[in-house]
């Protein structure tokens, strides 16, 4: 299934990153070289000088801890999706330049087809994660967490800090050029 494994070991002041073959034996110390038991499988060991234990080895993320209980999440999520559905229906009804548009909302899934040239947006609830997921033909998939209070909260993509409504405000006006678009006036975008 996988040709190799990735192993990271850290020792005070040093780290060793190695790709090991399937039958390689783990190294005892970071300074040792990994020798595969099968000659066809190569191994690479890289010594990393001046490794800092406090260094973040992943992308920076914005804190988005949701404090909503289940019932509040359901209400906030439903209010958000209902408002988006109503607004998309209003926008597509007034969009004379778009052919074949359709807006459908059922069982927590909002599907907005903006025609063959522009694609389909899918916005849906993810109750187990207390998230709203977006699939955009322009920017791809994103997962939004609710941040803030019910009175002053918004749905945030934790990797960029951009809200759901900000992303829609960025993408949709480029499609609906003949009318003004303002997603930032909808609930839960403050």
UniProtKB/Swiss-Prot annotation:
Its EC number(s): 1.16.3.1
| GO CC entries | axon cytoplasm; mitochondrial [2Fe-2S] assembly complex; mitochondrial matrix; mitochondrion
What Pfam families is this protein classified in? Frataxin_Cyay
Keywords in alphabetical order, please: Heme biosynthesis, Ion transport, Iron, Iron storage, Iron transport, Lipid metabolism, Mitochondrion, Oxidoreductase, Steroid metabolism, Steroidogenesis, Transit peptide, Transport
* A GO MF label: 2 iron, 2 sulfur cluster binding
Question: Which Gene Ontology terms describe the biological processes this protein takes part in?
Answer: [2Fe-2S] cluster assembly; adult locomotory behavior; axonal transport of mitochondrion; determination of adult lifespan; heme biosynthetic process; intracellular iron ion homeostasis; iron ion transport; iron-sulfur cluster assembly
Q: Which CDD domains match?
A: Frataxin (cd00503)
Which subcellular locations apply to this protein? Answer: Mitochondrion
**Effect of disrupting the coding gene:** RNAi-mediated knockdown results in nearly absent pupariation and reduced ecdysteroid peak level required to proceed to pupal stage. RNAi-mediated knockdown in the prothoracic gland results in delayed or absent pupariation.
The record, for InterPro entries, names:
Frataxin, Frataxin/CyaY, Frataxin/CyaY_sf, Frataxin_CS
Reaction catalysis annotation: 4 Fe(2+) + O2 + 4 H(+) = 4 Fe(3+) + 2 H2O
Task: Please indicate which superkingdom the organism of origin belongs to.
Answer: Eukaryota
User: What's the family?
Assistant: Belongs to the frataxin family.
Question: What does the annotation say about its assembly with partners?
Answer: Monomer (probable predominant form). Oligomer. Interacts with IscU. Component of the mitochondrial core iron-sulfur cluster (ISC) assembly complex at least composed of the cysteine desulfurase Nfs1, the scaffold protein IscU, the accessory protein bcn92/Isd11/Lyrm4, and probably fh/frataxin.
Q: What does this protein do?
A: Promotes the biosynthesis of heme as well as the assembly and repair of iron-sulfur clusters by delivering Fe(2+) to proteins involved in these pathways. May play a role in the protection against iron-catalyzed oxidative stress through its ability to catalyze the oxidation of Fe(2+) to Fe(3+). May be able to store large amounts of the metal in the form of a ferrihydrite mineral by oligomerization. Required for ecdysteroidogenesis in the prothoracic gland which is necessary for larval to pupal transition.
Name of this protein = Frataxin homolog, mitochondrial
Q: Give the species this sequence originates from.
A: Drosophila melanogaster (Fruit fly)
């Amino acid at each position: 299934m996988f040709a190799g494994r990735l192993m990271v070991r850290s020792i005070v002041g040093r780290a060793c990153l190695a790709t090991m073959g399937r039958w390689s034996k783990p190294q005892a110390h970071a300074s040792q070289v990994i020798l595969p038991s099968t000659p066809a499988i190569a191994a690479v060991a890289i010594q990393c000088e001046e490794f800092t234990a406090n260094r973040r080895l992943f992308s920076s993320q914005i804190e988005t801890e949701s404090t909503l209980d289940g019932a509040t999440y359901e209400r906030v999520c439903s209010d958000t999706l209902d408002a988006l559905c109503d607004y998309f229906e209003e926008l597509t009804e007034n969009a004379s330049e778009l052919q074949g548009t359709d807006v459908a909302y059922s069982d927590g899934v909002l599907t907005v087809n903006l025609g063959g040239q522009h694609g389909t947006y899918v916005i849906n609830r993810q109750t187990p994660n207390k998230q709203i997921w977006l699939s955009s033909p322009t920017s791809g998939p994103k997962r939004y967490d609710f941040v803030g209070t019910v009175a002053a909260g918004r749905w945030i993509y934790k990797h960029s800090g951009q809200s759901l409504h900000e992303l829609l405000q960025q993408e949709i006006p480029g499609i609906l050029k003949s009318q003004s678009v303002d997603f930032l006036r909808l609930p839960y975008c403050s």
